[in-house]
């Protein structure tokens, strides 16, 4: 069965205290939490990884993880795609003064054109001094 791991990585990390939380190392070797999650997903049989990111972090994201993960995925015949969450990409009008992304629902909506198989959503969350992740089935 074809399956997709949809990784929400566009958050602004306002509670995280600066920096891009998705790119923060979690061990001495510089791995980030997505490294482990993606490797596990490949072993579980996922065929596609889709990153939901913001356009303004695209280059840094690809430098830190994207290019490396693309090589790992290619070696296992897993495809990688990127979609961009944009605050203006919503049905209807943007409320005056809105500056933050719309969250989970709008992020998944941003990926609608590349989600052609059953998928699992992975969210990376911060809480005070730690980073956690959650899988939504």
Ranges and model annotations:
Residues 125-127:
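The conserved acidic donor/metal-binding loop of glycosyltransferases
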Residues 3-4, 31-121:
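Conserved N-terminal catalytic core of the sugar/cofactor nucleotidyltransferase
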Residues 13-15, 90, 129:
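Short, acidic Gly/Pro/Ser/Thr-rich loop/turn segments
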Residues 24-31:
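Short, glycine-rich nucleotide/cofactor-binding loops
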């Amino acid at each position: 069965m074809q399956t997709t791991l949809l990784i929400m990585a566009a958050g602004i990390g306002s509670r995280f205290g600066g920096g891009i939380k998705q790119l923060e190392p979690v061990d001495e070797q510089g791995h980030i939490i997505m490294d482990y999650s993606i490797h596990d997903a490949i072993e579980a049989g996922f065929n596609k990884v889709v990153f939901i990111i913001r356009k303004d972090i695209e280059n840094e994201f690809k430098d830190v993880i994207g290019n490396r993960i693309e090589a790992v995925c290619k070696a296992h015949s897993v495809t990688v795609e990127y979609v961009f969450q944009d605050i203006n990409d919503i049905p209807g009008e943007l409320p005056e003064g809105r500056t933050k992304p719309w969250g989970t629902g709008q992020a998944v909506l941003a990926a609608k054109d590349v989600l052609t198989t059953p998928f699992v959503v992975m969210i990376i969350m911060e809480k005070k001094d730690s980073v956690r992740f959650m899988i939504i089935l």
